[in-house]
Amino acid sequence: MDIKRTVLWVIFFMSAVMLFDNWQRSHGRPSMFFPNVTQTNTASNATNGNGASGANAAAAANALPAAATGAAPATTAPAAQAQLVRFSTDVYNGEIDTRGGTLAKLTLTKAGDGKQPDLSVTLFDHTANHTYLARTGLLGGDFPNHNDVYAQVAGPTSLAADQNTLKLSFESPVKGGVKVVKTYTFTRGSYVIGVDTKIENVGAAPVTPSVYMELVRDNSSVETPMFSHTFLGPAVYTDQKHFQKITFGDIDKNKADYVTSADNGWIAMVQHYFASAWIPQSGAKRDIYVEKIDPTLYRVGVKQPVAAIAPGQSADVSARLFAGPEEERMLEGIAPGLELVKDYGWVTIIAKPLFWLLEKIHGFVGNWGWAIVLLTLLIKAVFFPLSAASYKSMARMKEITPRMQALRERFKSDPQKMNAALMELYKTEKVNPFGGCLPVVIQIPVFISLYWVLLASVEMRGAPWVLWIHDLSQRDPYFILPVLMAVSMFVQTKLNPTPPDPVQAKMMMFMPIAFSVMFFFFPAGLVLYYVVNNVLSIAQQYYITRTLGGAAAKKKAS
């Protein structure tokens, strides 16, 4: 029994270490096992034009504009004053800064249904404490960029009840013989914003500009449940390398690894539950850049060249900007691979089917809390044969525990003889001390995957269960579920054989207290899953142990 307990403790410890190491790498800290790999083409080479080719005028013209915070350059003296243009749709309230025609504030709104309250979260913002912007401009000459003040084209700024789309247009001043008209198109019920950049050559010579589209964000963390850390930072998706997360720490160390040139994919900023992404037209060649532009400010973007525009002619560059919740099915329909911003970590291959099943169950019951309960019940049913094998092994070990203790006492001065005697006992009684370990090992990845499913799913946000649980993404306000969790763990320890080692016995008694303290701050949906899982495990163990006990009694009576 001691050997089995030791193996289970090792498995538990290694699982915890792997989860911690995954969190370390997701937050820019060095891995305990894997060295950081430096990309062959660094971000600075891709964006700043430094190096062998950076000395020529073309590279200088294509350098990204400064003034990362959106302030006007010091050289622009009496310039037009920038204004904030407020707008609203059925899913957004926001502000567009006429300096650059930049999307400077965007609040996602979700109306309640009478049972649930209205929900809102601010994604883009530009305040003294937080910066998160979506902006565009031109490169390749002294052309309009995000530092220039645009003029708003007259038109409505709210989505009317009888309208399906809202268009907001902004016109730049003429610079370098070029004028830009930037148009945002908002569609009812959609988190995808159309962004059209019309480039007009009003000069006397041809121009060959490039359009840049970028997301600018500081590294301030978003609110997440205590002890539950999720990825925050830029991400790049291409057909070549698929989904590449980039930590702020890797950018700081110039170790960001990502594809720097493609004609497909998207770039994004990812945080818990929500993301933003620029999705250029497929087939259009673009350079990708990720860089640090201030001590706490970063940007990820694309530079897309435009064919030469003759005088009096114009060119249009269209792209889509996603800014919304990480709802998996919705993301799948927007762009290839966009659903990967919903980060399941290293258990994605198991977590995605689990979420699919959870979603199907929710479609039947209409409540995410009950869907969690039913999914846990289904998983326990699937693993019942494995659990039964584990509990049977534990029951058999419990039966011979007195004899094992007697052998340990008898041969305590001779460990070699003690081990030989224990092996002989196992052989005689046909008991495998590791027999209960394999079923547990097989189930661990599934339980960890379900943990990540419940932690990463924005569907839990604002979702009620019963009575006092009004939001499964928040902690239990009265700590009822964590207390039930502690009680269920305590009952489980009582059902298991008491370890012969007093220190180990005290540790097993202390575990329910330690875990319950941690679970006090976990989202209610996660704690609900663990409570249901523990209760079902207790029922399974009680049933199997009682069945085995009855069979043993009948055998003894006969």
From Swiss-Prot:
Q: Which GO terms describe its biological process?
A: protein insertion into membrane; protein transport
User: How is this protein organized at the quaternary level?
Assistant: Interacts with the Sec translocase complex via SecD. Specifically interacts with transmembrane segments of nascent integral membrane proteins during membrane integration.
What domain of life does the native source organism fall in?
Bacteria
- Can you say where in the cell this protein is located? Cell inner membrane
- Spell out where the chain crosses the membrane: 3-23, 364-384, 438-458, 477-497, 508-528
Q: Name one GO cellular component term.
A: plasma membrane
* Stretch forming the signal peptide: none
Q: What protein does this entry describe?
A: Membrane protein insertase YidC
Q: Which Gene3D superfamilies match?
A: 2.70.98.90
InterPro entries per the record?
Membr_insert_YidC, Membr_insert_YidC_N, YidC/ALB3/OXA1/COX18, YidC/Oxa/ALB_C, YidC_ALB_C, YidC_periplasmic_sf
User: Which Pfam family, any one of them, does this sequence belong to?
Assistant: 60KD_IMP
**Membrane protein topology class:** Multi-pass membrane protein
The UniProt function text for this chain reads: Required for the insertion and/or proper folding and/or complex formation of integral membrane proteins into the membrane. Involved in integration of membrane proteins that insert both dependently and independently of the Sec translocase complex, as well as at least some lipoproteins. Aids folding of multispanning membrane proteins.
